[in-house]
Amino acid sequence: NQHVGNFPGVTVDRKDGVIRNHKEATVTDLPGIYSLSPYSNEEIVTRDFILSEHPSGIINIVDASNIERNLYLTMQLMELDTPMVLALNMMDEVRANGGTIMVNQLEEMLGIPVVPISAAKNEGIDELIEHAIHVARYRELPGRIDFCTAGSDPADPRGAVHRCIHSVGHLIEDHAAAAGLPLRFAATKLVEGDTLIEKALQLNPNETDILGHAIAEMETVTGLD
C-alpha cells in the first residue's frame, strides 16, 4: 500500500507505504541523491527528513554497476548514527557483464549488512526487508571507518582532515546535542563549509573564529580549500 504526497515547501513527491506482511513498518521513499550536501531540493528534503524524523533505519539503495559513485553517499549516511542496510541494486546486470562485487568484504569494511538485489526481477527483496527490520529493531548502528590510521605527524596530510573533524567535534559537542544533530556528521559538514549546519548550531563569534582557524590549518597541510 502506498500514499503519494509532497514535502512541505517543495514540489518533491513524498511516497509512504507499508511492507506486505510487515504492517508495523512504514517506509518513506526519499528522492534519489548522490550526497547530503544541500545543493538541490532533493538533497535538502532527504537530509532534513533523516535529521528531523529520526527514522528507525535506512535502506540505502545503490546502483551496483556504478558503485564507486554511490559509496560517497553511503559514507555520509553512516555518519548519521542510524541503523542502515546497503542494497546493491542491478546485480543481475553486473553479473551479465562479467563483473563481481565482493559483498562479504564490503560488509566487513562498512560494518553494515550488504544485500545484492535486482528490483526489476524482484531478487533479494525479502532478504533486504528482513535485514532492514532487524537492524532497525535492534538499533544496530553502522561501523565507523577511521581515516586517520596513520599520520600522527601534524604535517602529514593523510590525517589532517580527520584531526580537523575531531577538533571541530570537541568545539561543537554541546551545540550539536542541543540541535539534535549527530556529532561527527555536524563536524564533517562544518569542515565542508555547510552554512545551513553552521546556522543550526548557533555558534558564538569566538567559536566561529576557532572553527575558521582549524579549517585554515587543515587547508595549509593538505593544500585543499
Regions found by a protein language model. Name each.
Residues 5, 39, 70, 96-99, ...:
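Alpha-helix N-cap/helix-start motif
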Residues 92-153:
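Canonical P-loop GTPase G-domain recognition
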Residues 17-25, 45-115:
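Conserved C-terminal guanine-recognition region of P-loop GTPase G domains, centered on the G4
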Residues 111, 138-141, 145-225:
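Extended helical scaffolds that flank P-loop GTPase cores
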Residues 1-22:
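Switch I (effector-binding) loop of TRAFAC-class P-loop GTPase G-domains
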Residues 9, 32-34, 64-68, 90-95, ...:
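Conserved nucleotide-binding/hydrolysis micro-motifs of P-loop NTPases
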Residues 17, 28, 44-48, 71-79, ...:
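Solvent-exposed alpha-helical segments within well-ordered globular domains of core cellular machineries
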Residues 2-4, 24-41, 64:
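Switch II (G3) loop of P-loop NTPases
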